[in-house]
């Protein structure tokens, strides 16, 4: 590094660290004094006096009783001395604490249009603060204890003159209640000290200057305990009155009925405040509770008596904040992704509007948490005979819209509970529909996919607006919790007989998206506004999704599948286990009819399996078969015999 680069860097470091090269020259600068040097600790002159850093003028924080100081400083090693004179301006800011005396004040309390006057003997502490030739007197009235000679509670926390707000905090006797104190602690009487400020040029009383004849109810029972001499008066938030239910009215100087001056020591000393733990007794309706409070301690010692004042610690005030639990954001629409049949869907948290998409048969959908208003739309599918419809619970305003599908004979319809308008949606015969709980408005949107018989659909939880999309047959739907007004709109998809449809929980708008079989879908967390997805109109798939490998050869195609489903249907060509149905392009068509038969067996279209088509059956070169994997939980368990059965079936077809 070059020298030209080192010097500026060193200079910057020196300035930043506050290090100054001592100046021992005899030249007098504008911001320094003869023989004075600057260091990290502040200023120090030749007389050995240390001053705070930052006082560069002739005014020092130290108070000098004299106006000039002569000192000699050896400047050269030869012993020559040079005399200098420094001007020290006496500080005009100081605080004087007078001795502790007693007086009798009158405390006026008003409640319900009646006022009561109580004479209380209190201690008086007068603090005189002089700031820039402005004299301010603070008179603090503190409750006395039964043993004033040993312990009392005057408020005498003094603030240095440099602070704009003198500390004059008074804590009621209840905050310093020793075991031997006879502090009045009743529901009708409260000894609340009044802090008063009487400056020479301006008078700023404590938090409230309330004369004896005027009563100001204190809503929080906080006595006036801190006074600012200038134009502000800051009440002490830590003051704990004896009685929590009584009103506090600070008394001003005019409320003193009699003033008894006791022996006043000539001198008093204020010791630096410390902290201690005292026991505070709070009484309400003849019941008292004891709590420990950490307070500041100011000890005033005189010739004969030591007065200890317990003052609140303002620097460590802890304001209790009500617990704010952050529940799942209610009213947030949640968009559920489709669930594969045989899948258990966990709905979004309660209070979240969920958009229900159609559920594939065999799927069990759990609705969103309760508390969301649900809007039920009428089902447009006729109800098969023998269907039992249960209307919404009573007390729930339901907007009934006409069902566009006739109800099959033999259907038992249960009307809504009294006082609850219910809109009945047609249910396919054999279907048991349970309406949303009372008090929850449910808006059901028509399901675009028919629900297979024996399907039970579980709607979103109550309190969440649920928009029901079509449910695939075989699905069990559980409605949302009651208490939400339900607006039933007709469902556009017929419900298969034997299907039990449970409406969405009241109050939770849930829009369910179609669920693919075999998939367990967890809906998006509540509180996230989601778009309303349009239900998929895919044909219901009654098989569990599995991973399938289709191998094409010159003569036949082999399908290896792993599935945990049970054979549910047997087409003309034979029984195919659920989860093995595949829509295949003819991979190795040996002849046209076989290919058609092979594809006709798989009536359920599966878009995730694709194979390459060979132009003619005579070609021997077969391209590698494409392998596609279904998204589902069925691929976890591998059972080879299912694959062999499917392969044999395809081979014979």
Swiss-Prot record:
It is found in: Secreted, Cell wall; Membrane. Residues 147-254 are annotated as: 15 X 6 AA tandem repeats, Ser/Thr-rich. Sequence repeats lie at residues 147-152, 153-158, 159-164, 165-170, 171-176, 177-182, 192-197, 198-203, 204-209, 210-215, 216-221, 222-227, 228-233, 234-248, 249-254, 326-345, 346-365, 366-389, 390-413, 414-433, 434-457, 458-477, 478-501, 502-521, 522-541. It is a lipid-anchor; GPI-anchor. Induction: Expressed in white cells. Transcription is regulated by the transcription factor EFG1 and up-regulated by alpha-pheromone, by host serum, in biofilms, and in high iron conditions. Repressed by BCR1 in a/a biofilms. The N-terminal domain mediates haploid invasive growth and yeast cell-cell adhesion. The regions containing tandem repeats are required to project the N-terminal region into the extracellular environment and to mediate adhesion to polystyrene and to host cells. In allele CaO19.8979, the N-terminal tandem repeat region is expended and contains up to 90 repeats and the C-terminal tandem repeat region has one more repeat. This is Cell wall adhesin EAP1.
């Amino acid at each position: 590094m070059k020298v030209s680069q080192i010097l500026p860097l060193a200079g910057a470091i020196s300035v930043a660290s506050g290090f100054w090269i001592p100046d021992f020259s005899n030249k007098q600068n504008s911001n320094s004094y003869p023989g004075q040097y600057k260091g990290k600790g502040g200023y120090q002159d030749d007389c050995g006096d240390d001053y705070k850093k930052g006082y560069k003028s002739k005014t020092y924080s130290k108070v000098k009783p004299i106006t000039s100081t002569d000192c000699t400083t050896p400047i050269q090693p030869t012993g020559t001395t040079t005399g200098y004179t420094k001007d020290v301006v006496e500080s005009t800011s100081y605080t004087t604490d007078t001795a502790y005396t007693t007086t009798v004040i009158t405390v006026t309390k008003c409640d319900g249009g009646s006022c009561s006057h109580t004479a209380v003997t209190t201690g008086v502490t007068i603090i005189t603060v002089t700031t820039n030739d402005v004299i301010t007197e603070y008179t603090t009235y503190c409750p006395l204890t039964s043993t004033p000679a040993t312990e009392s509670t005057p408020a005498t926390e003094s603030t240095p003159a440099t602070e704009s707000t003198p500390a004059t905090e008074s804590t009621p006797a209840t905050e310093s209640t020793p075991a031997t104190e006879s502090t009045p602690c009743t529901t009708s009487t409260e000894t609340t000290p009044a802090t008063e400020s009487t400056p020479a040029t301006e008078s700023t009383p404590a938090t409230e200057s309330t004369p004896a004849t005027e009563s100001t109810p204190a809503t929080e029972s906080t006595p006036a305990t801190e006074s600012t001499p200038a134009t502000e008066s800051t009440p002490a938030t830590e003051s704990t009155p004896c009685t929590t239910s009584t009103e506090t009215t600070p008394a001003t100087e005019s409320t003193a009925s009699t003033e008894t001056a006791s022996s006043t020591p000539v001198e008093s000393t204020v010791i630096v405040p410390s902290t201690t733990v005292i026991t505070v007794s709070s009484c309400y309706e003849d019941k008292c509770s004891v709590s420990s409070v950490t307070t500041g301690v100011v000890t005033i010692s005189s010739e004969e008596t030591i007065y200890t004042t317990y003052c609140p610690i303002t620097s460590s005030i802890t304001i209790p904040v009500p617990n704010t639990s952050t529940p799942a954001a209610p009213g947030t629409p949640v968009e559920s992704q489709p669930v594969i049949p045989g899948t258990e869907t966990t709905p979004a948290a309660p209070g979240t509007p969920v958009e229900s998409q159609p559920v594939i048969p065999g799927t069990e959908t759990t609705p969103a948490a309760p508390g969301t208003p649900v809007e039920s739309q009428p089902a447009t599918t006729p109800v098969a005979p023998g269907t039992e419809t249960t209307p919404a619970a009573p007390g729930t305003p339901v907007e009934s819209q006409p069902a566009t599908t006739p109800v099959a004979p033999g259907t038992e319809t249960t009307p809504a509970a009294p006082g609850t308008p219910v809109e009945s949606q047609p249910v396919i015969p054999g279907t048991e529909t349970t309406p949303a709980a009372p008090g929850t408005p449910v808006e059901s949107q028509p399901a675009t996919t028919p629900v297979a018989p024996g399907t039970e659909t579980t709607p979103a939880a109550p309190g969440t607006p649920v928009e029901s999309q079509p449910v695939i047959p075989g699905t069990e739907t559980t409605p949302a919790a009651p208490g939400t007004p339900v607006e039933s709109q007709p469902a556009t998809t017929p419900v298969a007989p034997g299907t039990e449809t449970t409406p969405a929980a009241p109050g939770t708008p849930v829009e369910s998206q179609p669920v693919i079989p075999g998939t367990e879908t967890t809906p998006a967390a509540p509180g996230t506004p989601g778009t309303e997805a349009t239900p998929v109109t895919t044909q219901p798939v009654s098989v569990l999704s599995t991973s399938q490998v289709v191998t094409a050869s010159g003569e036949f195609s082999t399908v290896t599948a792993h599935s945990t489903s049970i054979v549910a249907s047997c087409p003309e060509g034979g029984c195919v286990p659920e989860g093995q149905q595949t829509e295949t392009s003819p991979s190795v068509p040996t002849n046209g009819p076989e290919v058609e038969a092979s594809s006709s067996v798989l009536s359920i279209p599966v878009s995730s399996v694709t194979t390459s088509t060979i132009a003619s059956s005579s070609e021997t070169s077969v391209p590698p078969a494409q392998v596609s994997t279904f998204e589902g939980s069925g691929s976890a368990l591998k059972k080879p015999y299912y694959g062999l059965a499917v392969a044999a079936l395809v081979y014979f077809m």
